[in-house]
Design a protein with these regions (language model features):
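Ankyrin repeat boundary/linker residues
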Residues: 35, 67-68, 100
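Conserved hydrophobic residue in the first alpha-helix
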Residues: 42, 74, 106-107
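Conserved ankyrin/ankyrin-like repeat signature
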Residues: 52-53, 84-85, 117-121
């Protein structure tokens, strides 16, 4: 009986550890980000590079300079190399020189991610 209880407790503990680890992604030894499955739909469309949805959401009133976690949609578009989304956001008034909580601009985030297209577009639009 004791073995059965201990086995069940170990399985529950291991399951909860695996569940918790899904919410944290280690990008490298010095960087990490929390993965939020309840991410704002506008930011999700930006990250995916869904230009049509981003345009529609802006038309419906989404703020191109909204911040989540200190970052703007433009910063996410730059980090994920979404050149067309960058053009759209800047065309609709996104602030190119805005800084996140760590002092990074969209250009710096593109550089850190080696997002070459994003860097080119941001240079053109600055």
């Amino acid at each position: 009986m004791k073995k059965s209880i201990m086995t069940v407790l170990m399985i529950l503990f291991i399951s909860s550890v695996n569940f918790a680890s899904e919410d944290l992604q280690v990008l490298d030894i010095y960087d990490y980000e929390l993965v939020d499955n309840n991410i704002d739909p506008f930011f999700k469309a930006v990250i995916k590079g869904d230009l049509e949805t981003v345009a529609k959401m802006i038309e419906d009133g989404s703020d191109v300079n909204l911040r989540i976690g200190g970052k703007t949609p433009l910063m996410y578009a730059a980090r994920y190399n979404r050149a067309d989304v960058i053009r759209l956001l800047v065309g609709k008034g996104a602030v190119v020189g805005a800084k996140d909580n760590q002092g990074n601009t969209a250009m710096k985030l593109a550089e850190l991610a080696n997002a070459k297209e994003a860097m080119e577009v941001l240079k053109e639009m600055s």
